[in-house]
Amino acid sequence: MDNNEVVTEEVAAVVENNTGIEIEPLFEEQVDFDTFSKSDFRVVKVKNCEAVPKSKKLLRFKLDDGTENERTILSGVHAFYEPEELVGKTLLAIVNLPPRSMMGIDSCGMLLSAIHNVNGEEKLNLVMLDDAIPAGAKLH
C-alpha cells in the first residue's frame, strides 16, 4: 500500500506498508467537538518512575503537572521502557479522567502513547515533547 493512500472502511483491521510496519485503521465513528474538548491534555514532567511491585507491566510515574500537587499515573509500559530512562522526560497526559485503582494504587490520568507493530512485534512509544515546554502547559 502506498503511504499516501487514504485508509477507508474497506481496509482490513491492520494496514501494512512495505516496511513491515503495521498500524490500526482510523476510527470511522466521529466525535463531536464538545465531547473532544472535555479532555484536558497537559504537559507533564517525570519526577520519578518505578516498577510497581508484583506487576510485570505497570510503571508508577510521579509527575509535575504544573500544580502544587504531585500527580501519580500508572502506565503499562514496562515491557517497552525501564523506569530510570523516563526520569526527566516531558510527556503528554490526559489529567481529568477519574482516578482508577490498579494494584491498589490510584492512577490519576493517562499517559499518551503510540502503538504499532513491526514485523509482527508490538512496539509502543510514549508521546515525548520538547523539554522547553513547561509542566502544566495545555494542549489545544
Question: Residues of each region from the PLM?
Answer:
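Phosphate-backbone binding interfaces of nucleic-acid-interacting proteins
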Residues: 1-140
